[in-house]
């Protein structure tokens, strides 16, 4: 692709924007209106004289020049409504509307907005009468020394007074002497804040906020921050005074809160949001908002952008910034120094020749023009701030030294510039500061807060033998106080495995703690041990208090169910060890039993003993790597409704059903002396856990028809096409634990178990096994799952979900309303449908077809064709999504792109399109016009396989439609659409069911007649 973009403005900011956009392979030309000498004539960049104040003429110019989008640099056009006017004319424009730009154009509006939305800012009051303003300055209970013109004043409308008298004088200058014209008709008197000022900018599409690295500007003309205010004499980025944690706080409390507030007030804000922030001892506070890049901040921020600026802007315009978040160059600093004309910010001379550009560029520096012009082939001064020299180096001091070399190379008479840009950061970095543990990523205060929150939860698990009191070096347990006489100790440790991944994806952390406790206490129960106390280990990269508290609360609750004390634990915050949002868990259980109650009694187990199965609650905590793989290949998301028969819950909730804890209910049964062995069915499933409690040369035969198998296992088996052995070796298949008992004691044991509210069955028997033969055999497992996945109708079993014929997975490609999409959705929702729509892909954002898909719960993707160099690249991006969703058939429903040959060949015989005529008549995009012009009395529509030649593929179905007297294109189109809604779904069903195929000879083949 080769796009043309237009930038509005003439300063250093606009030159920087043009320079960065020209680096994109998507861009063939950058036009700048009106531009300067730096944007006049480079390889991709040139100026245009089009008026930027006549928005109607500008819109027409954009259409004639095929401008992809317009980027507005300065604030005045934004306040004048350029964005809304261009968008109304059908031209994409990057920036906020005039209504949203009031954040900058009206200081009063901005302050009132911040107050409404709780955005931290200085105390203030607005005035339209100078005497009232002065009275307020003199009587305020805070230093009311900042006087601001409420309107736009080219960045110079702020006066910071040193005394109340000076502040009153500033009021007179602004309001009576009209120092800033109409901008000063309303003024804002503000509290003087103490601290350092930084610039925090972000991209935003009205929802997502993508912060840029923080920068610091230098407003004063002279070194040491002396002299008058200017538009900015230099900047550097990133500002080390803003830590990552502080930037995140500014993002949440200022940038995101502002964007959310504008959305709530019905004025969505898109483009660049710039917050001038004062770093006070009470936290960051907003000094002002700007609605565009700062100048000269732009000259140090964009050089650090690694991403393609064109793609970032396009995704912002499309409302998809979250899919194209900018990436920034790390471990580098950009520093820029502005060279200004003699006399600036007052009167200055224009037309002074500038030399030395080649020498500066030879040093590896970027020179961004601002107030420059071309005169007789020479670059001359044409403004107060003339240009900026930018250096990008590994550190701030190196960048400043390199920039100074460029300043020495570039010469023009009377040039003034500062040599101390970055002095505050250098002083900050040179301060003797000891590194804190928190700066390295470990927040001890947050850890202490967590302990306070979980202490009462742990304390509630105290039991005989143990009084829980967190905070010591170790916990104690008194076996004698717990009633033991001659005890043995048993210990077990376990984790939760990749079930954690699902909990983290579903943001559901309150039940995973029970899984951890259950896995440990059920293991020691196999020794006959009563769980006494439990210890947990929680590790993460960054401590999230709410998540960690939810997990530990779940652990404490589970300890209560198990009858053990949560005696202690470890919360390990380890920066860089885990990605954001991820954590890991491990648990340790210690239990005890009297010496004569130890299990298993291997010497007592004999051939003919009975195997009793105890019901599981579901998957428990094993096999989740396989589960996640199956879900990824299925048509369901974790947020989808669970499969039929699995309850009114999401798939994620179903899979996260916590592991059953057996200690409280089964311990009395185990202590009866009638149980010979207990096996916890954990990793390794039925096949590998039961042999762990059997003597050599003995095994078990199990019959799956004797127990209830939860339907989730049937769904997993069907979706994953899992073998009987794979199911039995991976999952518990509905049996969470197994007891081995004698035949004589079986009925009593079953009664005892059921008394304790557990579901149990006789599921098999102990048998002799020859050496080398399988220790566990399970019969009827797959058959039981088939029945389990079925329902009884009219006395016979019919498939419910598990073994119905697999439906063809369909992708629908659209460009707009997707006129046939709804008909396809409705058809595939029918119970006997042979197809299911798994993904809808659009090459345009925010179109009606996407809304239809989302309402139907179908995943959507937007793949913007404008971001790709050619059709093949674009089609390859689509193909990746089709592979991701394991698509079988592609339907084109109003997809307005011509597909490339390789893509069509790959999907030959698997891609359908519909055309609004009876092909081969009236091919092309104006079929209805052709039908009306030729005077035919019958037209219609055709569903066909897609071929490389347009509308030339093999015909699957056709439907005739009469052409009536007096028909127009509109009336005929509506009548044909009704026929399309009928035959497109029908054709899809024919192909999905295998009734119609494209034969090897390239002709339609009817495999069977319906």
Swiss-Prot record:
Gene3D superfamilies: 3.40.50.20, ATP-grasp fold, A domain (3.30.1490.20), ATP-grasp fold, B domain (3.30.470.20), Formyl transferase, N-terminal domain (3.40.50.170), Phosphoribosylglycinamide synthetase, C-terminal domain (3.90.600.10), PurM-like C-terminal domain (3.90.650.10), PurM-like, N-terminal domain (3.30.1330.10). The record marks 951 as: Raises pKa of active site His. The active site is at residue 915. Mg(2+) binds at residues 288, 290. Binds 1 magnesium or manganese ion per subunit. The modification Phosphoserine is found at residues 10, 440, 796, 802. ATP binds at residues 190-193, 197, 220, 229. The modification Phosphothreonine is found at residue 682. GO terms for biological process: 'de novo' AMP biosynthetic process; 'de novo' IMP biosynthetic process; 'de novo' XMP biosynthetic process; adenine biosynthetic process; brainstem development; cerebellum development; cerebral cortex development; GMP biosynthetic process. Keywords: Acetylation, ATP-binding, Ligase, Magnesium, Manganese, Metal-binding, Multifunctional enzyme, Nucleotide-binding, Phosphoprotein, Purine biosynthesis, Transferase. Its cofactor is Mg(2+); Mn(2+). It catalyses: 5-phospho-beta-D-ribosylamine + glycine + ATP = N(1)-(5-phospho-beta-D-ribosyl)glycinamide + ADP + phosphate + H(+); N(1)-(5-phospho-beta-D-ribosyl)glycinamide + (6R)-10-formyltetrahydrofolate = N(2)-formyl-N(1)-(5-phospho-beta-D-ribosyl)glycinamide + (6S)-5,6,7,8-tetrahydrofolate + H(+); 2-formamido-N(1)-(5-O-phospho-beta-D-ribosyl)acetamidine + ATP = 5-amino-1-(5-phospho-beta-D-ribosyl)imidazole + ADP + phosphate + H(+). CDD domains: FMT_core_GART, PurM. PANTHER family: TRIFUNCTIONAL PURINE BIOSYNTHETIC PROTEIN ADENOSINE-3, TRIFUNCTIONAL PURINE BIOSYNTHETIC PROTEIN ADENOSINE-3-RELATED. Homodimer. The N-terminal ATP-grasp domain carries the phosphoribosylamine--glycine ligase activity. In the N-terminal section; belongs to the GARS family. In the central section; belongs to the AIR synthase family. This is Trifunctional purine biosynthetic protein adenosine-3.
